[in-house]
């Protein structure tokens, strides 16, 4: 029977994953809070102390730092000497390590954090197990992100958990532990940047970097321009998160944390033009992110309008010469790798909230057409583009999109029909190929009726209202194709 050690601070999906491992004939060992959760869920699990024959001591500071754990992880299965030494010491092989670390970054993000709190959230045993398992990836599977649970299970069931895939997991581990250690160094060095002011001039502010990863705003290389402001940083982060969702050339423009124009195309120049045309007024003074290198041709287009920040994975030398003619525009070079951090947090009075990032994308095959009329191919393309964008828009959110750009955005309204009115009234075009996209369900049929009055012929929304049928009936009445996804995307 294979053995797995599970010790996680982020408990997302761990119970389901552990149950599946037991069904695949894994014997589970765990520590502290993880073991308690598995026990409560009636998942068969043993204490790591059963491996080490040594109790957890010093309030859990020493749990897994033991030869019985690390010998079982690090042994090279191809070396008889290693296996003989394990046998002599009565040490069992460990085949899988599932660990994520104490939430140091989240802890120190609290402005009132004490030094003792920070120190207690420095993980020692977790990184040690992760690094050991990652080093021995040829024989041991190591998982640091809950997002990888499902694929690991699929590969176990299909007997395709091969060395190449384990190596990809190994890379994630060393990226994760490097960022973790860097966050610790930055905190204790006091690595914070004083900003001119906060959201408004009467508010003081500073920027604390907990990572210097090249795919983050904190790790961006600023090539030109003034110091980033508090609002620049927030808007740039929102812009970057959205543009990374696109594989095709894409451009995102953001104002006040909301997209004002999103465009895709065969080239990045075409994508920018589509984003600009989506709302040529609101982009003025905004933040623009592009997921392809900025060429001289594109730089001329960008230079022609006032922008606060331009983000791209690369700027050619000629493009830089053009853009640097404006002394204040901030130019940020950022790796477009998708952020592997699965959590986000926000401070509230007396504490902070932590949640998984809203990265889930519903596959098209799981979406359901609920009306008599089905979407055309072009309407499907418009829906899927809008569905990528809508999680980045403040709720209540309604987007209008075609297959190359957003054409109208209604954001941050207290009722859904109000958001729809804004999107419809500001739309640069409405025709049979434009889709209406909603981040939440329709509580009644009025939004669909309003859409019909403006000529909308395709709608995508989560569904889930007790009055879903009213909206479906209204769509059928007007010959509108409606798709439900089963997943909402509120953003506050």
Curated annotation (Swiss-Prot):
Transmembrane segments: none annotated. Pfam families: AICARFT_IMPCHas, MGS. GO terms for cellular component: cytosol. Keywords: Hydrolase, Multifunctional enzyme, Purine biosynthesis, Transferase. Residues 1-144 form the MGS-like domain. Pathway: Purine metabolism; IMP biosynthesis via de novo pathway; 5-formamido-1-(5-phospho-D-ribosyl)imidazole-4-carboxamide from 5-amino-1-(5-phospho-D-ribosyl)imidazole-4-carboxamide (10-formyl THF route): step 1/1; Purine metabolism; IMP biosynthesis via de novo pathway; IMP from 5-formamido-1-(5-phospho-D-ribosyl)imidazole-4-carboxamide: step 1/1. InterPro entries: AICAR_Tfase_dup_dom_sf, Cytidine_deaminase-like, MGS-like_dom, MGS-like_dom_sf, PurH-like. PROSITE patterns: MGS. GO terms for biological process: 'de novo' IMP biosynthetic process. SMART domains: AICARFT_IMPCHas, MGS. It comes from the Bacteria. It catalyses: (6R)-10-formyltetrahydrofolate + 5-amino-1-(5-phospho-beta-D-ribosyl)imidazole-4-carboxamide = 5-formamido-1-(5-phospho-D-ribosyl)imidazole-4-carboxamide + (6S)-5,6,7,8-tetrahydrofolate; IMP + H2O = 5-formamido-1-(5-phospho-D-ribosyl)imidazole-4-carboxamide. The keyword Transferase applies. Its EC number is 2.1.2.3, 3.5.4.10. GO terms for molecular function: IMP cyclohydrolase activity; phosphoribosylaminoimidazolecarboxamide formyltransferase activity. Belongs to the PurH family. This is Bifunctional purine biosynthesis protein PurH.
